[in-house]
Amino acid sequence: SDTLQYIKFFFREGTAENGGFQNFSLIFETNIRNAILNECSAEFSNMYLMLLDYLADYMYFDLKTERISNENFSRTVEKFNQTRRTAIKPKSFLISCVNANILTEATDDFAVEFHDKNTYAYFVAKALNRQFEKDPTELAKLKFVMQHICFGINDTIILFLSFIRSNTRIITAIQVAAQDLLQEFQEWDFKERNIPFLQYAQKTSAGVPSKKDRKETKLHTERVEEERHNTIKFRGIFDYDEGDVQKEKYVILRALKYTQLIGRGLVDQYGNLDANEVDSLVSSLYSLPQKIVYAILKPQQEHVDDIVQSLLQFAKESMPEEHITEEKIRHLLADAGTALALNILNDIAFNATNKSTIHALESYSPHNNNAKILRLMMQENTGDTA
């Protein structure tokens, strides 16, 4: 339909320009409400939406499942009826939600599930929001989502939650969490050479990216993000080992996820944030990525000689005709480390920058050369490198 085409266009163009999540969230929420209204009367629609929150909360936090049996589904509806003094019929509720493409019946095992993982994440976020409104001090479920942000749909839940509440406290809480995770790490600073093996990187000359280059880079980023979501579609959102949560690599990845969310939050909440909050977030966006780079590369630095010798031995045994030298391997390691570092910086620049936020981002006084590079990346993401 024309409406669907418009929504697709608005999502594609709006998010590319905005750099955040707000446009998608607004359309998503509107579509959910309209879909329910098309299937039942207005008096039932609000009850159905609250029951969907209740169902998502129970499935996600209590059952930790993507599917709920038909029997358990009916019991959950009846429990909602008892606690809320409502009289919703499980079958009527299910039919309406299936027709609205919110729930799906899995006929192969007589179960019910949310239509897709974004819909599931949205209603979990709505349930969390409702809990905050009742008791702002009850944070156990939010802490679970934050701690598991590297896994499943938890990052999407946080994004929806920050939009639903339009509350800057969520973004500032994420900022504090990121700072706590990275407090023991210093910032990567190539002038100070605190990751010495990167000094072997081979120098290359490159010009300022053209408009075509920036467009191709943006399209590539969108394709990567789409592939990531498609991968999640076919992988269970609870398919992870709880023991992995506190492993150092996931702690650093969690800090990276938090920093990405700070950038998106700056974009989505810009205008709602006080000046001192903006300044604090901007300062973190310049500092935290450098700490993440340091945290990732420091273990490699500590064992770089062993890594070089191991690779050198491998090269001699596997490809003696190439005559690969130790110097060549050090160059390759440095090039790879530098590329990783710059990709992390550019990822944060991409998430934090649009035509509104660039004013605050440019106003920050860079405290080292790394920060100057990050600022250039932010300018490039708005097409302003003049």
Regions found by a protein language model. Name each.
Residues 17, 21, 25, 44, ...:
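Intrinsic-disorder-associated interaction segments
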Residues 130-315:
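Hydrophobic repeat-domain scaffold segments
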Residues 276-386:
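Charge-dense, extended regions
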Residues 69, 89, 165-167, 274, ...:
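Helix N-terminus capping/helix-initiation residues
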Residues 118, 138, 149-156, 185-186, ...:
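Generic helix N-cap/helix-start motif at coil->alpha-helix transitions
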Residues 1-131, 144-152:
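Extended hydrophobic
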Residues 13, 34, 38, 58, ...:
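Surface-exposed polar/charged interaction patches
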